[in-house]
C-alpha cells in the first residue's frame, strides 16, 4: 500500500497505473474514487475521453475533496511512515507479539524489492499476537488510540482483525492458506 509519493510504477515500465483516491491521496476518509495514470499522453487522452463519454468521472465535490487531500499528501505520508517505523520497532521486541510483517524489516520476504522500488517502506503493518483470537481480541480492547475499522490511508489510526473483518467470507482453511490467522492484526 504505497501512495504515488512512495512508489511510481511508470518509472519501472508500467503503461498504466491505477491509484485509489479513496485512501492516501484523499487521506480524510470522505471520498470514494480512483485515478488512472498513463505513461503515454495519447493513451491518457483516450482514457479521459472515454471516462467523460461514459460518465466515469468523480463529482466536482469529490474531486475537490481529493485535491484537498493531495495538497497535504506529502506531509501526511511522512508522518505515517515515521509513526509506522516507531510502531514496528516497538512490536518487533514485544513479548506478546509473535510476528511482525513489514517490508522495512530486513527479514521480510519483500524487503529487497521494496527497498529498490519504494522511497520508504510505507505505513501498513501486520502482526500476530500471543493467544490466537482471544489474544487479538484482548489487544484490540486494550487500545486507546486506534479505532477498530476496515480502511487505510486516512488521518485516523485504525486496527483491523482480517480473519473476522476484511477476510471473514473466506473459510478458516483458505484464510490460513493465505497467511491469515486468528492472531493476525493490521494497523493503518
Question: Across the structure, where does each feature detected by a protein language model lie?
Answer:
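Conserved PLP-enzyme active-site core in the AAT-like
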Residues: 1-95, 101
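Conserved C-terminal alpha-helix-loop-beta "cap" of PLP-dependent enzymes
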Residues: 96-185
Amino acid at each position: 500500500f504505497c501512495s504515488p509519493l512512495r512508489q511510481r510504477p511508470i518509472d519501472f515500465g508500467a503503461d498504466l497505473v491505477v491509484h485509489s483516491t479513496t485512501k492516501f491521496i484523499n487521506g480524510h476518509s470522505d471520498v470514494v474514487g480512483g485515478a488512472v495514470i498513463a505513461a503515454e499522453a495519447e493513451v491518457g487522452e483516450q482514457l479521459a475521453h472515454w471516462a467523460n463519454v461514459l460518465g466515469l468521472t468523480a463529482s466536482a465535490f469529490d474531486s475537490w475533496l481529493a485535491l484537498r487531500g493531495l495538497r497535504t499528501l506529502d506531509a501526511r505520508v511522512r508522518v505515517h511512515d515515521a509513526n509506522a517505523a516507531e510502531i514496528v520497532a516497538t512490536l518487533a521486541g514485544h513479548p506478546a507479539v509473535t510476528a511482525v510483517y513489514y517490508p522495512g524489516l530486513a527479514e521480510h520476504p519483500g524487503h529487497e524489492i521494496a527497498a529498490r522500488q519504494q522511497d520508504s517502506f510505507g505505513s501498513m503493518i501486520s502482526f500476530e499476537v500471543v493467544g490466537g483470537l482471544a489474544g487479538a481480541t484482548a489487544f484490540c480492547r486494550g487500545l486507546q488510540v486506534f479505532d477498530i475499522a476496515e480502511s487505510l490511508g486516512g488521518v485516523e489510526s485504525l486496527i483491523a482483525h482480517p480473519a473476522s473483518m476484511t477476510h471473514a467470507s473466506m473459510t478458516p482453511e483458505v484464510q490460513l492458506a493465505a497467511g491469515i490467522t486468528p492472531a493476525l492484526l493490521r494497523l493503518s
